[in-house]
A protein has these predicted regions:
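Intrinsically disordered, low-complexity regions
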Residues: 1-115
């Protein structure tokens, strides 16, 4: 996970929206699997909005579809729609901060035995 978080920070600094959007999708998958479905929905939606601006590789569409299925299994439709709307409205910097903060909190809870 440290490499993913560090590469996400670097991509943000470089302004590489294509790979940053892909990393947001990767972080969304991790968070969906660790019980943070609303944040995951925000991130995958922000990443997809970034890719809509520049185009996207086909493998990423499949990856994000699989991530959305994980998220939808954990959220009802109103919560999912609201999280997606919030995610699309996030600035890339805010999306990265949200992803990394949530991931750090989840990791700390796991280490402490409370998550």
């Amino acid at each position: 996970m440290p490499l993913l978080t560090e590469s996400t920070r670097i991509l943000l600094e470089l302004g590489d929206r294509g790979f940053l959007g892909a990393n947001l999708g990767r972080l969304a998958r991790v968070l969906a699997l660790s019980g943070h479905a609303e944040t995951a929905a925000e991130l995958v939606s922000r990443g997809e909005a970034m890719h809509a601006e520049i185009g996207v590789d086909p493998w990423l569409v499949t990856f994000n579809d699989e991530t959305r299925a994980l998220i939808r299994a954990r959220l009802d439709e109103p919560a999912y729609a609201a999280a997606c709307e919030r995610g699309r409205a996030l600035a890339p910097e805010a999306a990265v901060a949200r992803a990394l903060d949530t991931l750090e909190s989840a990791t700390n809870r796991t280490r402490a035995g409370t998550g």
